[in-house]
Every structure is written in C-alpha cells, then in structure tokens.
Amino acid sequence: MLRAIAEERGRLSLRREVCGLGCFKDDRIVFWTWMFSTYFMEKLAPRQDDMLFYVRRKRAYPGNEGTIDGRKAEAEPEVEVEVYRRDSKKLPGLGDPDIDWEESVCLNLILQKLDYMVTCAVCTRADGGDIHIHRKKSQQVFASPSKHPMDSKGEESKMSYPNIFFMIDSFEEVFSDMTVGEGEMVCVELVASDKTNTFQGVIFQGSIRYEALKKVYDNRVSVAARMAQKMSFGFYKYNNMEFVRMKGPQGKGHAEMAVSRVSTGDTSPCGTEDSSPASPMHERVTSFSTPPTPERNNRPAFFSPSLKRKVPRNRIAEMKKSHSANDSEEFFREDDSGADLHNATNLRSRSLSGTGRSLVGSWLKLNRADGNFLLYAHLTYVTLPLHRILTDILEVRQKPILMT
C-alpha cells in the first residue's frame, strides 16, 4: 500500500511537469477510490478499527464581501471529517465529488494502518559532544484527528484535522520519573511503523533544555504564590502545573510538556538516583554533532492582576519574556554554552529542603533570584500536520535515535 501511494505521488509530480494541473483529475479519482475500497472497505486486518473516515470538502460561496473588482473571489472549501461504521448504510458513494479521496486514503492510513511509539528522555551532553541518556520512557500512542485540553479532564473533543494529535491522557503516571535538573535537557521522539514492523520512520523530534523550561515555568507561576512560599519559610508548597509547548524543527508540529516543580520533600527515585559513571542510566549512545538548543521566543507571560506590590523593572522585563517552548532547529545541535555535566549531579545530591532556614536568612533572601530546582517534565501530546507525517513516512524515513 505504501509503495503504491509513493509511486502515485511520483507520477503526480511527473505529470505536473509535463501537462500541468487538472488534465488527469479523473484518472486520479479512479486510483484513490480504488485504494480506499481495496485497503479499507474490503480488507479488514485483525486489529483494524471498524470506523471509516471521509474528508469532505464543501464548496463555499462568498457573498458581496468576497468580491474583487466586481468579480466573486474563489472561496476556500470548508473541510469536514465524517466518520462512519464500516457496515453503515449511509456511507458516501465511491466517486462522490465532494469527498477528497486522496486525503481520505491518507487519513485512514495514518489512523489505522500504522503504529506509533513516543519516547521521552532526559539527557546531558559531554564536552566532546556525546549524548548521555540518563533515563527514558517509551509509550505507545494513537493518532487522532481530534483533540481535547490536557489541563482539564472530561471536556469534549474538537476536530483538529488536518493536524493529527498523539495524546497521552495518563501523562503523570506514564512519565512519573521524568525529572530534569540543571545542565540536562528533555528530548522527545515519535516513531511510526507499519503493523508488521518492517519499517520505522521518525515523524517528530524535539528538545528543550532545563534552563529554558525553568525560565518559562518561573514566568508562568504567580509571583504572589512564590512570595507566599518564601514568607512561610518553606512550609507553603506551590504545586502548580504549567503546560509548555516545544516546537519541532523548522516549525514542524509541536509537543506539549506538563511542567511542575518537584516537591522539596519528595522521596521519589528522582532525588536519589545514582549518577556515577558506572550507573546504567549513563548509557553511552552514539556521538551526535548537533545537540538540541532551543531558540528564544518572545511572547507575553501571565501576570496576576491581584498583585498590588510594586514590581521592580527587571522583574517586569522577565515576566514579559517567553512562556512557550523554543524551536528545536535540529534534534541534536551543537551548543556554545558549554553545559557542565557536574551541575546535574550536584543538584540531585544536595538537599532541596527549605524548612531549616532561619528567620533572618529567609528575610534576606526574599528579593534574591530563586535557585535551581528539579522540574517534572511530563509529555502530554505531540501534534503534526497530516502532510508532514506522510512525507516522513513515504520519503524521508529517518532512523530513530532514542529508541535504539
């Protein structure tokens, strides 16, 4: 099936060069309706869903406001995704002119014929450029043409097509041990494969450094909540979770991370991991010449309107900085900052408890910048445009890095 689609796409490119667009439209409809009928209506794999997805393009007719020089401008057709059971009597007829049969085939291919595995890893980079994976977690995910907010359960799903979502509803349980500290970075990789696992292809890779995550988290968290924590000498625990986006290379899709601060009294393994070179978490992977470095994005941050205290100018400037994750121009890209690997080890070995501070010491530290602390980084979803997934599957087929 994949070979037939790739060959048809190749013929399409060739015909465009020879005779231009439109001269072979009927021929293409015949091909794509045959593909739809053969691979989705007649052949039913053991694990295949009994649902069929149709991409319908409704013709839109503009009103008077849609005119240019007295002529009606051609309006973009409205796109809808219709879902039917395979045995439904209301199935659209093969050859229905309002159905985009090519996109319908591609959508059903992505939703039903492929398996997806997402891997989230916490890594550091050595001075020589080698990447060390400290821990990683892989989880099977499923493609969907709809989405729902991850910060509130029970809300209705909304159609997201042509963007395809790969969601992890139980992200806190799945990635419970994904904590990131100073000098570390979070890497995400999404891999597609066919049902027989005869081929694998990376369709998303992204990364974000701890320093960028912490900056976003600090900007998002209410200043009042942090002040209350300091005034209570560490007894007040701010446990807010912030959702941060990580853009893919060249803007190809994005991933979302649920970021929260590790509690100072946390006794989970994330605070007691053995970081010695002999530890299996320091598994050496292949040398990469391009470690991830996120680029800054300036977007307004949340500010609590109830805060009456005058805020210094430098703090106001900080709050105006980015609250979204940065582009990963390449998955592993050379970084000039020279991150120190020992920082991550020292952070995990020292005590994070703030309850032993003296009264005077706490007051003196009120106006100081917060020190580094561990952050939970839970992957919630990855989303990609359908056409980018197809290109990576049919043409690129990049080999996985984190899954090896």
From Swiss-Prot:
**Ranges of Basic and acidic residues composition bias in the record:** 319-336
**What segments bear the compositional bias annotation Polar residues?**
262-278
Q: Where is this region: Disordered?
A: 262-307, 319-340
Q: Is Phosphoprotein one of the keywords? A: yes
Q: Which UniProt keywords apply?
A: Phosphoprotein
Q: Which residues carry this modification: Phosphothreonine?
A: T290, T293
Task: Give the superkingdom in one word.
Answer: Eukaryota
- Positions carrying Phosphoserine: S268, S276, S279, S304, S306, S324, S358, S362
Claim: Iron-sulfur is one of the keywords in the record: no
Q: Which residues cross the membrane?
A: none
Record InterPro entries: DUF2045
Q: Which PANTHER family match?
A: KIAA0930, ZGC:172139
**Name of the protein this chain belongs to:** Uncharacterized protein KIAA0930 homolog
Q: Which organism is it from?
A: Mus musculus
